[in-house]
Amino acid sequence: MVKENMTAKKTRYISVRNGGEETYVENIPASGRMRNYLPAAKLRLREIQRVMPLGKWSITIEQQWKDNGITRFQMLDVTTGKLQESVL
């Protein structure tokens, strides 16, 4: 199970995708937990789907930080609530 990093200095943003292709990114505050932004992101996803129903829309809340020269990412899927981690 992936745990959210709460200690590192990080950048956090909302990523909107259509069919897997990123179409919009918005920076959000890095304070607090990523799950605190779920209600607003779910509302935004519903609004997008209502206006453009033919797209395969998804939203993730993402954060990234440097750890000993390695860039780490965490992605929270708004629909499933699943948290994933990646290292670059």
Predicted regions and their residues:
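Short intrinsically disordered terminal tails
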Residues: 1-11, 80-88
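Compositionally biased, intrinsically disordered low-complexity regions
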Residues: 8, 22, 34, 65-67
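Short aromatic-glycine-(Arg/Gly/Cys) micro-motifs in beta-strand/loop hairpins
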Residues: 6-26
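A short, exposed loop/beta-hairpin motif centered on an aromatic-Gly-Thr core
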Residues: 21-39
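Intrinsic disorder/low-complexity segments, especially N-terminal tails and targeting/processing regions
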Residues: 4, 16, 27-30, 61-63, ...
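Short, mixed-charge low-complexity intrinsically disordered segments
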Residues: 46-88
